[in-house]
């Protein structure tokens, strides 16, 4: 150990650490109380991706109970606004924008935390809601081999598995854009959960055709987040990707209220303690 002061900031609810791969980005973590530097057992990893409000630490804190119950380390990345241009707030949702590869930033964070703690980082759990839901399903398209399971919560815009539409409306030019073919066989092996509030029906934000990242064709997925997540589910199932799908009655666009259902899904994927 590097001393009590260092250990204090690196245990349980950690401080915010700059990502060494690219210090414009940072992350915090939660390390279960029973973690012992002198033991050899490895902990599972769950990555929780914030939405547009960037409340990464709040999401980390909301998973403390899950971490303690399941011996899971929680990683909560922070993708600040204004990265690709001043005042923009959406670029991370689309995974790769201009010269920024947000998926590689996240993988670098996973690598960094795996060097500090005994964590099974080769495959991890991934959840995101709203803007985070946009990021995680597109990350899934790029790196299914790294995922133990993915939870997609109420994304405002979706990337349909439609080969007739260009990225990020569809995946028609996926190979041209990313240099590899869409890894459908690997995607079929990853457990997928989709969740949205049954009353998540506001449309003003997700149908703004003047928004910087709007593309013609996004509207074809539906008018509301509920309709769009149903479209994404149907898209997955047409390609043989099994989906556990849930609309929570009476719930609007409330990311913290879906977490009990997300945790229940994650628990089905972890080995019993």
Role assignments for model-derived ranges:
Residues 1-45, 58, 127-129, 134, ...:
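A domain-start/cap signature at the N-terminus of enzymes
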Residues 22-23, 98-106, 165, 224-225, ...:
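Phosphate/oxyanion-binding active-site loops and adjacent basic polyanion-contact surfaces
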Residues 23-25, 41-122:
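Serine-hydrolase catalytic machinery in alpha/beta-hydrolase-like enzymes
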Residues 43, 47-49, 153, 196, ...:
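Alpha/beta-hydrolase
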Residues 78-82, 156, 251:
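Short beta-to-alpha linker loops that shape the active-site pocket of alpha/beta-hydrolase fold enzymes
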Residues 138-148:
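Conserved hydrolase catalytic core segment
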Residues 149, 154-239:
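The feature captures the conserved acid-bearing segment of alpha/beta-hydrolase catalytic domains
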Residues 226-273:
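C-terminal catalytic histidine-bearing segment of alpha/beta-hydrolase fold enzymes
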């Amino acid at each position: 150990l590097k001393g009590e002061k260092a250990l204090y900031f690196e245990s349980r609810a950690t401080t915010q650490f700059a990502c060494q791969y690219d210090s414009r980005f940072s992350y915090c973590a939660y390390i279960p109380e029973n973690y012992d530097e002198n033991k050899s057992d490895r902990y599972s990893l769950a990555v929780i991706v914030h939405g547009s409000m960037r409340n990464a630490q709040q999401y980390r804190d909301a998973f403390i109970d899950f971490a303690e119950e399941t011996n899971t380390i929680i990683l909560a990345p922070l993708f600040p606004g204004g990265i690709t241009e001043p005042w923009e707030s959406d670029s991370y949702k689309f995974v790769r924008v201009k010269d920024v590869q947000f998926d590689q930033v996240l993988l670098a964070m996973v690598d960094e935390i795996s060097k500090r703690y005994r964590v099974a980082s080769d495959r991890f759990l991934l959840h995101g809601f709203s803007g985070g839901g946009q990021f995680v399903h597109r990350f899934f398209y790029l790196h299914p081999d790294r995922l133990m399971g993915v939870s997609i919560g109420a994304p405002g815009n979706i990337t349909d598995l439609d080969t007739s539409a260009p990225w990020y409306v569809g995946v028609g030019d996926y190979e041209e854009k990313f240099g590899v073919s869409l890894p459908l066989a690997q995607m079929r092996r990853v457990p997928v959960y989709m969740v949205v509030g049954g009353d998540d029906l506001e449309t003003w934000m997700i149908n703004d055709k003047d928004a910087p990242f709007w593309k013609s064709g996004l509207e074809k997925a539906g008018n509301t987040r509920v309709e769009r997540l149903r479209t994404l589910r149907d898209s997955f199932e047409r390609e043989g990707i099994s989906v556990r799908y849930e609309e929570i009655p009476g719930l609007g666009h409330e990311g913290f209220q879906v977490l009990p259902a997300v945790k229940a899904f994650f628990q089905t994927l972890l080995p019993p303690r």
